[in-house]
Amino acid sequence: MAKALQGVMAALLTPFDHQQQLDSESLRRLVRFNIGQGIDGLYVGGSTGEAFVQSLAEREQVLEIVAEEAKGKITLIAHVGTVSTAESQQLASAAKRYGFDAVSAVTPFYYPFSFEEHCDHYRAIIDSADGLPMVVYNIPALSGVKLTLDQINTLVTLPGVSALKQTSGDLFQMEQIRRAHPDLVLYNGYDEIFASGLLAGADGGIGSTYNIMGWRYQGIVQALREGDVAKAQRLQTECNKVIDLLIKTGVFRGLKTVLHYMDVVSVPLCRKPLAPVDEKYLPALKALAQQLMEEKA
């Protein structure tokens, strides 16, 4: 079953309205837009989805809406991670109920948990997911949890774990993980090194910028399948030009602004305390949206 999880998975954004409430209609349009651009699946409720500034009820509502739009059409992975094991279990149960294909969880953070506590946290979530495969989410830059290679090797061999989302620039470690676990589904997490991650052994990727240019990442996959490394590098360079701009604007708010100009997202706002895009970047983001729409067409 784990091999069905391979591919290009957009880390789904969560649209909000001017009152900072969930914009369900924009969310539905965004799901349909992603399906239309040919991505293999959605990773719902993660960092890109601003999960950690949402209530548990809101996170469940997002899962429900996404399932209504996409279940059976593409692979659906629910990120259910929180600092609380009980809350993560509740979200895992919801993911199972709504028909998701897998669950994922970031390592619990903020408190200095022992490694055995991390393992127990994952075991509990896996139990509540009732048969859904687990995607361990390693993102040390945001979680503050610096797992060693030995600890990663232990986590990915827990019963019920089928995949790892490796959001790290350490490509040597990516290759070490692949060598140690040839059957593990391994996702590259940093969009700017997607092609390099595939060459280091990743099966696919989970990324935020796939929301606006998923076809480019699919093109990188296809180029490498055909042995055309030069084409993969060219496509990665084009992606990275976009990422350069988004880093300046703030990635999530920049993506929402581009999608607003594409008529996908009604309001290009993140949830506070994240601020709106600086107006000086709006012309560049509008031009990017136009460029991508023409390219997609």
Curated annotation (Swiss-Prot):
Which Gene3D superfamilies does its entry note? Aldolase class I
GO terms, molecular function: N-acetylneuraminate lyase activity
- Pfam families assigned: DHDPS
**Entry's HAMAP family?**
N_acetylneuram_lyase (MF_01237)
UniProt subcellular location = Cytoplasm
Positions the record marks as coiled coil are none
Q: Which GO terms describe its cellular component?
A: cytosol
Q: Please name the CDD domains in this protein's record.
A: NAL (cd00954)
Q: Where does aceneuramate bind?
A: 47-48, 167, 189, 191-192, 208
Annotated GO biological processes are:
carbohydrate metabolic process; N-acetylneuraminate catabolic process
Q: Which domain of life is it from?
A: Bacteria
What keywords tag this UniProt record? Carbohydrate metabolism, Cytoplasm, Lyase, Schiff base
Q: How does it assemble?
A: Homotetramer.
Report the pathway entry: Amino-sugar metabolism; N-acetylneuraminate degradation; D-fructose 6-phosphate from N-acetylneuraminate: step 1/5
The function of this protein is: Catalyzes the reversible aldol cleavage of N-acetylneuraminic acid (sialic acid; Neu5Ac) to form pyruvate and N-acetylmannosamine (ManNAc) via a Schiff base intermediate.
Q: What is this protein called?
A: N-acetylneuraminate lyase
EC number from the UniProt entry: 4.1.3.3
Task: Report the leader peptide range.
Answer: none
Q: Where is the active site?
A: 137, 165
Tell me what gene encodes this: nanA
Give the matching SUPFAM superfamilies: Aldolase
Report the catalytic activity.
Answer: aceneuramate = aldehydo-N-acetyl-D-mannosamine + pyruvate
Q: What class of enzyme is it?
A: lyase
Similarity section:
Belongs to the DapA family. NanA subfamily.
